[in-house]
Amino acid sequence: MALMFPRLARNFARNGYFPTDEVTLERALQALAPAPSGRMRICDPCAGEGVALAEAAHILGRDKVQALAVEYDRERADHARGLLERVLHSDLFDTMISRQSFGLLWLNPPYGDLVADHSGASQYQGSGRRRLEKAFYQRCLPLLQYGGVMVLIVPHYVLDDELTGWLSNHFTGLRIYAAADPTFKQVVIFGIRVRRQDLARADANQVRSRLQAIGAGQEKAEEIPAAWPW
């Protein structure tokens, strides 16, 4: 499946922004399937050029989804506006978005350490290493409905004890794959949001251990597949 929408010409990594390579993006998108009925709201809170969310809307059916993108960089936000109806050019941490509003959360957050003067630092709640990826995860998780799907794209080494604990307590059906292009050491994580009391604890612990091993470099995630069994 080739991408339908044009990418920004100068779409290169800078200032914590790391675009997903096209092969990984194509394969991750192929894992999505439209809901059998009704409309779905989908969100990319770190939308970059907007291509990932535009492609997701196309796959899920433009007439069946309402898409919201948030992007900090003006040039990328302007490009996204050419692909999507609703694009906020804003710092995500300055936005007010209703909780549990979305059935799909596509999250490829900025990568790097969370410095004290970052807008998300005052809202951060955690005891482990302070990372941008974790701050954006905390900010975005409440936006996703229970039963909704998250696609999270982060470097594997961010999967420390704290983040893997959050993931295994917030999601069921977690699957992790290595990006097709290893340049940024990214992994793609799929999960379905669930209430903690509904988790199978033994399964959650097993998944957490695997995520920790991949994060520590003790185990390698398999490459994201070119075809899915559904």
What is each PLM-predicted segment?
Residues 49-62:
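Conserved SAM-binding loop of SAM-dependent methyltransferases across substrates and taxa
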Residues 1-37, 52-54:
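S-adenosyl-L-methionine
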Residues 96-104:
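A short acidic, Gly/Pro-enriched loop at the edge of an enzyme's catalytic core
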Residues 66-71:
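Conserved SAM-binding motif I beta-strand of class I
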Residues 184-230:
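Flexible, glycine-/basic-rich loop-and-beta segments that form/coincide
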